Regions:
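Short beta-strands and strand-coil junctions in structured, solvent-facing domains, enriched
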Residues: 23, 46, 56-58, 67-69, ...
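Phosphate-interacting basic helix/loop segments used at nucleotide- and nucleic-acid interfaces
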Residues: 1, 79, 136-141, 234-237, ...
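N-terminal accessory targeting/assembly segments
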Residues: 1-94, 99
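Residues that form or immediately flank small-molecule/cofactor binding pockets and catalytic motifs
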Residues: 19, 55, 100, 122, ...
């Protein structure tokens, strides 16, 4: 009876077809986000999604556009359900498009179940705080802005900066210490070019990272509505792997700016009143519906950690996308154009970057006992060196003391040896800490005021004692 009813819930009362939207007559029982099938006069069919429900009219976003939709001969069939992702352990090692269809040449997924891409809200009382160190192999993150299991830590980038290279490097290198077999990566590329899509796919395949990863690739030429479904498909796959397969999942979403631009475009199509810089007023809520799917849940072995990557228009960190993301997430990694000009990779600005959950993932039992002291002394040393560099441009380097020159050299070494590393080199957290100690060995021992004496005796190279 239910399948028969699905075929009777249809209409030919299409009043408007504009860009990728259809405005049709409302019928009883229509739900927001419901999937529809648009059947053209030629017999060809396209999938759409209900994005607005009114008493008189309903607005449908059509995947693939409405250029061939004839108002008289086309009809809309309602499916009675929302967009769902087929899930099974076979998701690992596969690559899909922004609608959930395989694009890697493999067969369709034989589903154990179908999960709504909008997710199921977790009981707030069952949520556990982020904890436990995730090693990315990048010193500027592992040493100074630690990523913790269950955290949401965005990367703020700019046009032309190497955020794609950093995303690919994290894809290859990230792991949970001692639990490699339980660790998985879910990657979503939103509105990327064909070149970028090819880069991510080849990177996953050539490095072997694909065996523990699931990829969702949405290209810039795909329908706008797919920009909105792509991260939700990725997070649905992550929830399945985390909550049903007991895996620790790291989700990388790039580029959130393309996602928000799609929100703005759809809002403009629907004639909504814009908010800041033309973005819809509900963008904060919409972004929160993505980011808040990260976390740890009591009684579940798995976890979801999210790294959203966004490009800030005009490098403006006060832009609404970066601003709202900063309110929801627990810190940020900021890329620096100044460091990029110095050919330092990854160009992470450690002064603007912050991980609010860092102290939950460092120290004995997670990284090493001296990590917090090394973290504080690294910032102090680099900050003083940067200050002296600015002063020397005014008063001249000749006016600097011998001690000042030591700090200038230490600051340069910090950029060249600690922050900078090859994109294919995975630096362990132990190596990261040792690199910092080697830089500290340049300084007078009495200047290491932020490090406990027992750690100085234990870790400082003998030549400087």
């Amino acid at each position: 009876m239910e399948s028969l009813q699905l075929f009777t819930r249809q209409t030919k009362a299409i009043s408007t077809a504009r860009r990728s939207l259809l405005v049709i007559e409302s019928i009883p029982g229509i739900r927001y986000n419901e999937i529809v099938e648009v059947v053209l006069g030629t017999g060809e069919s396209r999938i759409g999604q209900v994005i607005e429900v009114g008493k008189v009219t309903t607005v449908v976003q059509v995947f693939g556009g409405v250029s061939e939709v004839d108002l008289l001969s086309s009809k809309v069939k309602y499916k009675g359900e929302t967009l769902k992702l087929p899930v099974s352990p076979d998701l690992l090692g596969r690559i899909f498009d922004g609608s959930g269809h395989p694009i890697d040449g493999g067969p369709p997924i034989v589903a154990d179940d179908y999960h709504d891409i909008n997710g199921i809200p977790a009981n707030p009382a069952s949520r556990m705080p982020p904890a436990e160190f995730i090693e990315t192999g990048i010193s500027a993150i592992d040493g100074l802005n630690v990523l913790v299991r269950g955290q949401k830590l965005p990367i703020f980038s700019g046009s032309g900066l190497p955020h794609n290279k950093i995303a690919a490097q994290i894809l290859r290198q990230a792991s949970l210490k001692g639990k490699t077999e339980e660790f998985a990566i879910v990657f979503a590329a939103i509105g990327v070019s064909y070149d970028d899509a090819g880069y991510f796919i080849s990177n996953l395949e050539e490095t072997g990272a694909l065996s523990r990863a699931v990829g969702f690739i949405n290209t810039a030429s795909s329908p706008v509505i797919e920009r909105l479904s792509t991260p939700r498909l990725a997070l649905t796959a992550a929830e399945y792997l985390a909550w049903e397969q007991d895996m620790h999942v790291l989700v990388i979403l790039t580029d959130i700016t393309n996602y928000c631009d799609a929100l703005r475009e759809l809002a403009a199509m629907r004639g909504e009143i814009p908010s800041r810089r033309g973005y819809p007023g509900y963008m904060y809520t919409d972004l929160a519906s993505l980011y808040e799917r990260a976390g740890r849940i009591s009684g579940r072995e798995g976890s979801i950690t999210i790294i959203p990557i966004l490009t800030m228009p005009d490098d403006d960190i006060t832009h609404p996308i970066a601003d709202l993301t900063g309110y929801i997430t627990e810190g940020q990694i900021v890329l620096s154009r100044a460091l990029e000009r110095k050919r330092i990779y990854p160009p992470i600005d450690v002064f603007l970057s912050l991980s609010r959950m860092m102290k939950e993932g460092i120290g004995e039992g997670n990284t090493r006992e001296d990590h917090n002291n090394v973290f504080m002394q690294s910032y102090a040393t680099y900050a003083e060196g940067n200050y002296l560099r600015e002063i020397s441009t005014v008063i001249g380097s000749e006016a600097l003391s011998d001690r000042d020159r030591i700090y200038l050299d230490a600051s340069d070494r910090f950029e060249q040896e600690f922050i900078s590393q090859d994109e294919f080199y995975r630096r362990s957290v132990e190596e990261t800490l040792e690199t910092a100690w080697n830089i500290f060995s340049m300084l007078p021992v009495e200047d290491l005021k932020l490090i406990q004496e027992e750690y100085i005796k234990k870790y400082l190279p003998e030549t400087s004692k």
